[in-house]
A protein has these predicted regions:
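Conserved NAD(P)H cofactor-binding loop of Rossmann-fold oxidoreductase domains
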Residues: 86-91
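The beta1-alpha1 cofactor-binding region of Rossmann-like NAD(H)/NADP(H)-dependent oxidoreductases
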Residues: 56-69, 100
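Active-site helix of classical SDR
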Residues: 118, 153
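Residue(s) in the substrate-gating loop at a strand-loop-helix junction
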Residues: 137
Length: 280
């Protein structure tokens, strides 16, 4: 049986690591994109020979070019059965006081980095008539206050996925989007760190302007684990997107996403009032 190669960006930790290990166990030859060699060595030690680390920073044109050369060598004419765009980062804080360089970096990773990765590896996906799975978020369907930059980057990912799904259909290439809500083990680390960084970047007088919503949202984040999705649920969605004869265009993952999508469908005024109630 010919090997089924799948490239996963952002495999060093969290969801990306879980995906890489699980797909290696399910018969894929996983090419795990990592930024540090040590992270790759750790993954390889745990997964065995079905996983090969590839140094890949989606925000670096040079790194992408080198990774493309390496992946071509590793796949030896088989192409990519799957490309999973998982690398991403979060930033939370008032839009008014978010530095432009932070905004640029979030979009460089979450949007431009995904586009550059697809552009670089699409010939290999086409060669295998493979699949593309983009890891988005419920934030790509519902805009939360104080997450405007992250929201915008995920809405952009949803839009480009919709366009790409139609553009690539003539070659039999399927494009799916996975939309997790809070995920266990990641949510406190990522959300609290990003939230703390946003808060710490403010001058004391600026911080005072937003003290109430900061306090409310900090409490909300601390309780998100109660409805957080297990990594396994996200992995299942990715696996289905890579293997199903009829993959979905979108996979909502987690109990919280079902509830939040109900909120997203409300009239604007009602939705705004509900969101305002969370922060005031």
């Amino acid at each position: 049986m010919a090997p089924r190669f799948v490239l996963i960006t952002g495999s060093s930790r969290g969801l990306g690591r879980s995906m890489a290990l699980a797909l290696a166990q399910r018969g894929f030859s996983v090419l795990a994109g990592v930024r540090r060699r040590q992270d790759g060595d750790d993954l390889r030690a745990e997964a065995g020979r079905e996983l090969t680390p590839v140094i890949l920073d989606v925000a670096s044109v040079e790194s992408l070019a080198m990774a493309r050369t390496e992946v071509e060598r590793l796949t030896t004419g088989h192409g990519l059965a799957g490309l999973v765009n998982n690398a991403g980062l979060a930033w939370f804080g008032p839009l008014e006081q978010t530095p432009i360089d932070v905004i640029d970096h979030v979009f460089r990773v979450n949007v431009s980095g995904v586009i550059a990765t697809i552009q670089g590896f699409l010939p290999l996906v086409r060669q295998a008539r493979g699949r593309i799975v983009n890891i988005s978020s419920i934030n790509g369907r519902l805009s939360f206050p104080f997450a405007s930059i992250y929201n915008a980057s995920k809405f952009a990912l949803e839009a480009l996925s919709d366009s790409l799904r139609v553009e690539l259909a003539p070659w039999g290439i399927r494009v799916a989007v996975v939309e997790p809500g809070a995920t266990r083990t990641d949510i406190r680390d990522l959300a609290v760190r990003a939230w703390a960084a946003g808060r710490a970047s403010l001058a004391p007088d600026q911080r005072a302007l937003y003290e109430t919503p900061f306090t409310k949202l900090t409490q909300l984040i601390a309780h998100l684990d109660s409805t957080a999705a297990d990594h396994a649920a996200v992995v299942e969605a990715v696996y289905d997107g890579l293997t199903s004869d009829v993959p979905r265009a979108r996979y909502l993952v987690g109990e919280d996403t079902v509830q939040l999508m109900q909120l997203a469908t409300l009239p604007d005024a009602e939705r705004d009032a509900a969101l305002l109630g969370m922060i005031s």
